[in-house]
Regions:
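Phosphate- and divalent-cation-binding pockets in alpha/beta enzyme and binding domains
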Residues: 54-57, 142, 176, 185
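Residues that recognize and position ribonucleotide moieties
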Residues: 101, 133, 176
């Protein structure tokens, strides 16, 4: 098992490269996301877009392997399909979004413990489904068939009988960063506990 980190987005709403944007401690947003994932002691593979040199340089510094998705501009579905095609030997993979730096490592460990080849595991915070989502190898063909900007929602809906809910008290599973204000709002709401 390992974590597939989707880091190939364009950051259009952020207005700059959000993955290398500095958090309050001076580290990059992506570094925070990766720190929590690394704490689970599971393999990581980041999916990046061609020419995203600032992100690949950061991944090199952090010693995180990555794969360049040649069709990343097509959207998240294309990046996810490409990433899954690179980790077909994993019994299950956690699909993590690079712009979600507030998830507790304990939540990630609990998700990992429940993963399996035949199931999907998703965190829920107060009845709202969050990220990351773990997919067993059974679902890799469906994930590899995705394209465009459609993420894994269709797979989740089609195989809802295989979904294992993990209720968590971790609002970070819902908090992504799309704009600079998202970082400020998360701090105001006390979500930034993982930024120590």
């Amino acid at each position: 098992m390992g974590w597939l980190v989707l880091a190939a987005g364009q950051s259009r709403r952020f207005g700059a490269d959000k993955l290398t944007a500095q958090m309050r401690d001076g580290r990059a947003l992506l570094a925070h996301t990766l720190a929590a994932l690394t704490a689970t002691e599971q393999p990581l593979l980041a999916v990046v877009r061609p020419g995203h040199n600032a992100v690949t340089a950061l991944l090199d510094r952090l010693d995180v392997p990555y794969t360049v998705c040649p069709h990343a501009e097509a959207g998240m579905g294309a990046s996810l399909a490409w990433g899954v095609s690179q980790v077909k030997d994993w019994m299950f993979c956690g699909v993590a979004l690079a712009d979600m730096p507030y998830i507790r490592s304990g939540t990630l460990a609990a998700l990992h413990e429940r993963g399996g080849e035949e199931r999907i595991v998703a965190p829920f915070y107060h009845e709202r489904q969050g990220h990351p989502v773990i997919f067993g190898r059974r679902f890799y063909p469906q994930l590899m068939a995705l394209g465009g900007d459609a993420g894994a929602k269709s797979v989740l809906q089609r195989y809802s009988d295989a979904l294992l809910r993990l209720d968590v008290e971790d609002r970070g599973v819902l908090c992504d960063v799309d704009t600079p204000d998202d970082i400020h709002e998360a701090r105001q709401e006390g979500v930034a506990y993982s930024l120590s």
